From Swiss-Prot:
Residues annotated as transmembrane: 33-53, 77-98, 113-133, 178-198, 226-246, 288-308, 320-340, 347-367
Cofactor note: Binds 2 heme b groups non-covalently.
Pfam families associated with the record: Cytochrom_B_C, Cytochrome_B
Name of the protein this chain belongs to: Cytochrome b
GO cellular component: mitochondrial inner membrane; respiratory chain complex III
A GO MF term: ubiquinol-cytochrome-c reductase activity
Gene this chain is encoded by: MT-CYB
Summary of the function given for this chain in its UniProt record: Component of the ubiquinol-cytochrome c reductase complex (complex III or cytochrome b-c1 complex) that is part of the mitochondrial respiratory chain. The b-c1 complex mediates electron transfer from ubiquinol to cytochrome c. Contributes to the generation of a proton gradient across the mitochondrial membrane that is then used for ATP synthesis.
Classification via SUPFAM superfamilies: a domain/subunit of cytochrome bc1 complex (Ubiquinol-cytochrome c reductase), Transmembrane di-heme cytochromes
Further details from the record: Heme 1 (or BL or b562) is low-potential and absorbs at about 562 nm, and heme 2 (or BH or b566) is high-potential and absorbs at about 566 nm.
Provenance organism: Massoutiera mzabi (Mzab gundi)
Binding site for heme b b566: H97, H196
Essential cofactor(s): heme b
Main location: mitochondrion
């Protein structure tokens, strides 16, 4: 078996990726989230496939087909809530994974990081289109508001929106194409994740100290496979607790009302994992300015390697940068909270201040603090 593992063309790839891979000996639990994302993706594809067997991508019957899945299909309710809450777990793991990369300077692996940012955009697009499919009130109005943002693009905006809609409003054509894209994108994400891993294993992983670990490597299996299984069990416990006890905790009650183009919900908002970006969008009174800020709030990750001014890679030995990083996390949580609040005082002002500080911390404060720390260490 050992010989087959090392000689068979396919087994050899799996062996070099998950078994005999030389890994740093000091990985912390923060390095578990990459494998957790892989498990989340597989779970989403499997549950999504079963949902697609019973779902109808038509404005007349989409809402009814989701109700039918929950009521009449064997364990349909469980598959549906595993898929909906699985997306939340996916984004929790994704945000922690990105946060780990920022904290420990993993963004200095340029190819891996850039593919990761593309993966983030693709995942966000997939999740947005999936949210439209149940065809509830929030699905319909969320799709209308978010796609309508493209009309802010000068000259081609209106034509672009109507092209995406497939008509003059969000309707049957929009739902059908969103379902088609929502079905195909996870497989594209899978391919991108393979490229992400390919680039990562080209140079070897970073580690908590941020220094070269070639002198102290251990095989991935059994050490990190066991550690990853522990992570899987913890995540499944959290996911099943959500699914079996609080299935609607992260959803919107408005989505249990069938889509009605004539009735606007009092407060249109996306899923919780987009609220931070939605808050940044809303904090700018100008439509085009808001759309630019929304895009930049994610695209800013691409520029992190260029703004790395520290002589050390990670933040493990830089207390000032650590402090600023956790302020940024608190800021993002504030933005998430604001995104779910109505547009009225004092939330407008809090949102504007949090949006401003988000960009200030990443673009100016953190690079400046890194330079200051270099001075402290006489570098």
């Amino acid at each position: 078996m050992t010989n087959l593992r090392k000689t068979h063309p396919l087994m050899k790839i799996i062996n070099h990726t998950f078994i005999d891979l030389p890994a740093p000996s000091n990985f912390s639990a923060w390095w578990n989230f990459g494998s957790l994302l892989g498990i989340c993706l597989i779970l989403q594809i499997i549950t999504g496939l079963f949902l697609a067997m019973h779902y109808t991508a038509d404005t007349e019957s989409a809402f009814s087909s989701v109700t039918h899945i929950c009521r009449d299909v064997n364990y349909g309710w469980m598959i549906r809530y595993m898929h909906a809450n699985g997306a939340s777990m996916f984004f929790i793991c994704l945000f922690i994974h990105i946060g780990r990369g920022m904290y420990y300077g993993s963004y200095l692996f340029l190819e891996t990081w850039n593919i990761g940012v593309i993966l983030l955009f693709t995942t966000m697009a997939t999740a947005f289109m999936g949210y439209v499919l149940p065809w509830g009130q929030m699905s319909f109005w969320g799709a209308t508001v978010i796609t309508n943002l493209l009309s802010a693009i000068p000259y081609i905006g209106t034509d672009l929106v109507q092209w995406i809609w497939g008509g003059f409003s969000v309707d049957k054509a929009t739902l059908t194409r969103f379902f088609a894209f929502h079905f195909i994108l996870p497989f594209i994400i899978m391919a991108l994740a393979a490229v992400h891993l390919l680039f990562l294993h080209e140079k070897g992983s970073n580690n908590p100290t941020g220094i070269d670990s070639d002198s102290d490597k251990i095989p991935f299996h059994p050490y990190y496979t066991m550690k990853d299984i522990m992570g899987f069990l913890t995540m499944f416990l959290a996911l099943l607790t959500l699914v079996l006890f609080y299935p609607d905790a992260l959803g919107d009650p408005d989505n249990y009302t069938p889509a009605n183009p004539l009735v606007t919900p009092p407060h249109i908002k996306p899923e919780w994992y987009f609220l931070f970006a939605y808050a940044i969008l809303r904090s700018i009174p100008n439509k085009l300015g808001g759309v630019v800020a929304l895009m930049l709030s994610i695209l800013i990750l691409i520029f992190l390697p260029m703004m790395h001014t520290s002589k050390q890679r990670g933040m493990m030995f830089r207390p000032l940068s650590q402090c600023m990083f956790w302020i940024l996390v608190a800021n993002l949580l504030t933005l998430t909270w604001i995104g779910g609040q109505p547009v009225e005082p004092p939330f407008i002002m809090i949102g504007q201040l949090a949006s401003l500080s988000y960009f200030l911390i990443i673009l100016i404060i953190m690079p400046s603090i890194s330079l200051l720390e270099n001075k402290f260490m006489k570098w």
